């Protein structure tokens, strides 16, 4: 596979994007007729094409990494940009896993006869055309393409300019897979230009694009949420909480508070604030202080919590809002379950929040009153993930209440339409 060394110059970006949109709309109608076997054949063929193109993928990725270093990208961004052999393996396995998932399209439920004699039910259908805007990670190209294809959606993928060579090499493999299954190449289109005007055009084409999914930093997501003329599936922050109730099992509380913070620091489902009931504080905070100190976690605590956290610095109002994505944790002691719930609903981001308790009553109240897309009892917030929820994979996590909420897998990329059977019925 020959590699081009630069992105093509496109004189009229808006016209180019509209052409992509028109082709995607036509392809989405064809995909509505595609069989599950045909979609799975394409996914397996994409996996084979990626496996055969390892050298090409690594060469393209080296060019992106070299350009990134020359442009001053920090090490964290370079790490996300890198396509290691293990990450290529993961992309290949991900395609095969999506192929093995049940196809939600065409599922019919709730069929019933009504007094008029008609039969009414619901059928699950694809959304149509999904636009994905993302940064850095080339593997998102494969993840998004596979989920959209399996759920019957055409997709337009606009990756970050820093990954343009990697994404174009991956796109070649995707096209090979589509061709092997006799599917239109426009079922998955990767935007070829790095011009930022492409994003503005993509999010302003309601006649072609049914939904936008942004994956990236807060600034990108805020801009798309503000400017998009089509629905957006997104979350802005991951300010996640663990609340240790007065009725908590101490060993569970320590294990969960440790894992939720220190298993990984950068994911959006990592705990950023620990709330502890005043009765539980002397039982769990000293042990947690030792654990966090051994792992280099900086604690920013309220005045009462600092009685058990000698090395903690005083928390400010900003700390309760903070998504650190780093070994930093805010800690607050509260007097009641009510105060904990109020804190979460005031400062949280409606992402994922957990309670540690042996009280069924307290657990049920927490589940009912915390306004988040995932609410947990006696489990680490790190479980808030499509794979861990048995969805197989996810396109992202939504903290909105419409259309999808929480990890968005195949079903979240579909909607339902009513279907009606009659036998010459007319309304009187």
UniProtKB/Swiss-Prot annotation:
GO MF, one annotated term: NADP binding
Enzyme class: oxidoreductase
Family: Belongs to the gamma-glutamyl phosphate reductase family.
Protein name: Gamma-glutamyl phosphate reductase
InterPro entries according to UniProt: Ald_DH/histidinol_DH, Ald_DH_C, Ald_DH_N, Aldehyde_DH_dom, G-glutamylP_reductase_CS, Glu-5-SA_DH, GPR_dom
Subcellular location: Cytoplasm
Family matches, as PANTHER family: DELTA-1-PYRROLINE-5-CARBOXYLATE SYNTHASE, GLUTAMATE SEMIALDEHYDE DEHYDROGENASE
CDD domains: ALDH_F18-19_ProA-GPR
Example GO BP: L-proline biosynthetic process
Principal localisation: cytoplasm
Catalytic activity: L-glutamate 5-semialdehyde + phosphate + NADP(+) = L-glutamyl 5-phosphate + NADPH + H(+)
The keyword Cytoplasm belongs to this UniProt entry's keyword annotation: yes
UniProt-listed Enzyme Commission number(s): 1.2.1.41
Functional description taken from the UniProt entry: Catalyzes the NADPH-dependent reduction of L-glutamate 5-phosphate into L-glutamate 5-semialdehyde and phosphate. The product spontaneously undergoes cyclization to form 1-pyrroline-5-carboxylate.
The gene coding this protein: proA
Provenance organism: Chromohalobacter salexigens (strain ATCC BAA-138 / DSM 3043 / CIP 106854 / NCIMB 13768 / 1H11)
């Amino acid at each position: 596979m020959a590699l081009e060394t630069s992105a093509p110059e496109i004189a009229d970006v808006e016209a180019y994007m509209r052409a992509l949109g028109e082709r995607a709309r036509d392809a989405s109608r064809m995909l509505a007729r595609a069989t599950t076997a045909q979609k799975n054949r394409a996914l397996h063929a994409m996996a084979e094409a990626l496996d055969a193109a390892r050298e090409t993928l690594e060469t393209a990725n080296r060019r992106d990494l070299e350009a990134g270093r020359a442009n001053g990208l920090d090490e964290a961004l370079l790490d996300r940009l890198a396509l290691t052999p293990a990450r290529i393996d993961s992309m290949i396995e991900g395609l095969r896993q999506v192929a093995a998932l049940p196809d939600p399209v065409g599922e019919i439920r709730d069929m019933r006869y009504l007094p008029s004699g008609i039969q009414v039910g619901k059928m699950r259908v694809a959304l149509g055309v999904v636009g994905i805007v993302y940064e850095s990670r080339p593997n998102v190209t494969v993840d998004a393409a596979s989920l959209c294809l399996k759920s019957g959606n055409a997709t337009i993928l606009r990756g970050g300019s820093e990954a343009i060579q990697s994404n174009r090499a991956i796109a070649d493999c995707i096209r090979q897979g589509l061709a092997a299954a006799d599917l239109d190449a426009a079922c998955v289109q990767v935007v070829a230009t790095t011009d930022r005007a492409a994003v503005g055009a993509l999010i302003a084409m309601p006649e072609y694009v049914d939904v936008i999914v942004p994956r990236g930093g807060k600034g990108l997501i805020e801009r798309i949420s503000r400017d998009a003329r089509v629905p957006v599936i997104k979350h802005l922050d991951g300010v996640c909480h663990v609340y240790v109730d007065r009725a908590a099992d101490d060993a569970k509380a320590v294990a969960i508070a440790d894992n939720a913070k220190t298993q990984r620091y950068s994911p959006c489902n990592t705990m950023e604030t620990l709330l502890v009931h005043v009765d539980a504080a002397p039982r769990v905070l000293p042990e947690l202080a030792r654990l966090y100190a051994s792992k280099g976690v900086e604690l920013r605590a309220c005045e009462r919590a600092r009685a058990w956290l000698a090395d903690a610095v005083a928390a400010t109002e900003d700390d309760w809002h903070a998504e650190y994505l780093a070994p930093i944790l805010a800690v607050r002691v509260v007097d009641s379950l009510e105060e904990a719930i109020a804190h979460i609903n005031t400062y949280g981001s409606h992402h994922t929040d957990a309670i540690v308790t042996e009280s069924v009553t307290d657990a049920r109240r927490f589940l009912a009153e915390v306004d988040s897309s995932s609410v947990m009892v006696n489990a680490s917030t790190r479980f808030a993930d499509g794979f861990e929820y048995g969805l197989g994979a996810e396109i992202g996590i939504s903290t909105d209440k419409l259309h999808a909420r929480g990890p968005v897998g195949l079903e979240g990329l579909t909607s339902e339409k009513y279907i009606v059977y009659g036998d010459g019925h007319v309304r009187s």
